[in-house]
Swiss-Prot record:
GO biological process: chlorophyll biosynthetic process; photosynthesis
The protein's name: Protochlorophyllide reductase A, chloroplastic
Involved pathway(s): Porphyrin-containing compound metabolism; chlorophyll biosynthesis
Family: Belongs to the short-chain dehydrogenases/reductases (SDR) family. POR subfamily.
Organism: Oryza sativa subsp. japonica (Rice)
């Protein structure tokens, strides 16, 4: 496929209004438009200035404001939707016909290509640029989304970075350790800013979903595999996770461990969900939830693990632990938490056993500590510039 780029600027959004034609739309002076004609296998990218495409064919919902039927689809934003669980969930939700999916991704064209390759129907999704490793990018995404004119009915904080073999930290554009900066701080700012959009929604069941992980839940067998997650007294986070004249680890440890940094970030995700619930559920009626959709042993999240692990882990999960879950099945589970009318309970950490229905799982003592959640919230607000 030949690629011709006629504008050197960062892509912001791309929607697919009709079959066979890709058109990027964001209300800014220079956006990218991607068009593809059926007869020629070429992709053309050009600068345009057009209003955002409207949300596709309607579904029915009850307006909270006036009790009337809202003849539109729900709109869900999913971070990290260009591959793995995020893409599978985007596809599952789009296929219901009840949701328009905004794929919030760092690699704009990768996401557009992935959606097309997955067979997502034209008009069922919009691709928008979001780099969670940059707080400025998070703010720009929120601004672009609001300029699009779309409502927000559900937000899924799914994207994650996992660098299990790293012994030296890398850092975000704002100078924070990468795993916590992307997995927690970037999502924290995104969720805080877009809470206002969720509050304005007239959709009958508004939801904010933050992905958890069994690896950050130390009351499980998997959660006790070294290195174990643990935030300590958050002294490293309080110091800014800079790594220079301080620690890049949340607990303040001197040595860096990429696997533990990821697990710690997942504790942060689960604590953040619960603090959202305590602060805003009663006031707003928004459902706040987390989940562990199962062990997706073939996910690209493991791409930086050692080759032997990538070779042996999938069959081990499939035939020994019996915990293997395909990306397609995990995507359906995430889609269920987003849209199933029976899963409206807030403050819940959802899980599944093999071939079982969803159930409310118990979090470890640390991952459900309200005092630690409040301290994490306050420190995170300072680090992302909200106070």
């Amino acid at each position: 496929m030949a690629l011709q780029v006629q504008a050197a600027l960062l892509p912001s959004a791309l929607s697919v209004p009709k079959k066979g034609n890709l058109s990027a739309v964001v209300k800014e002076p220079g956006f990218l438009s991607v068009s593809q004609k059926a007869k020629k296998p070429s992709l053309v990218v050009r600068a345009v200035a057009t209003p955002a495409a409207p949300v596709a064919s309607p579904g029915a919902g009850t307006s909270k404001a006036d009790g009337k039927k809202t003849l539109r689809q729900g709109v869900v934003v999913i971070t990290g939707a260009s591959s793995g669980l995020g893409l599978a969930a985007a596809k599952a939700l789009a296929e219901t016909g009840k949701w328009h999916v905004v794929m919030a991704c760092r690699d704009f064209l990768k996401a557009a290509t992935a959606a097309k390759a997955a067979g997502m129907a034209a008009g069922s999704y919009t691709v928008m640029h979001l780099d969670l490793a940059s707080l400025d990018s998070v703010r720009q995404f929120v601004d672009n989304f609001r300029r699009s004119g779309m409502p927000l009915d559900a937000l899924v904080c799914n994207a994650a970075i996992y660098r299990p073999t790293a012994r030296q930290p890398t850092f975000t554009a704002d100078g924070y350790e990468m795993s916590v900066g992307v997995n927690h701080l970037g999502h924290f700012l995104l969720a805080r800013l877009m809470l206002d959009d969720l509050k304005k929604s007239d959709y009958p069941s508004r939801r904010l979903i933050i992905l958890g992980s069994i690896t950050g839940n130390t009351n499980t067998l998997a959660g006790n595999v070294p290195p174990k997650a643990g935030l300590g007294d958050l002294r490293g986070l309080a110091g800014g996770l800079r790594g220079q004249n301080g620690s890049a680890m949340i607990d303040g440890a001197e040595s860096f461990d990429g696997a533990k940094a990821y697990k710690d970030s997942k504790i942060c995700n689960m604590l953040t969900m619960q603090e959202f619930h305590r602060r805003f559920h009663e006031e707003t009626g928004i459902t706040f939830a987390s989940l562990y959709p199962g062990c997706i042993a073939t996910t690209g999240l493991f791409r930086e693990h050692i080759p032997l692990f990538r070779l042996l882990f999938p069959p081990f999960q499939r035939f020994v632990t019996k915990g293997f879950v395909s990306e397609a099945e995990s995507g359906k589970r995430l889609a269920q938490v987003v849209g199933d009318p029976s899963l409206t309970k807030s403050g819940v950490y959802w899980s599944w056993n093999k071939d079982s229905a969803s159930f409310e799982n118990q979090l470890s003592q640390e991952a459900s500590d309200p005092e630690k959640a409040r301290k994490l919230w306050d420190l995170s607000e300072k680090l992302v510039g909200l106070v």
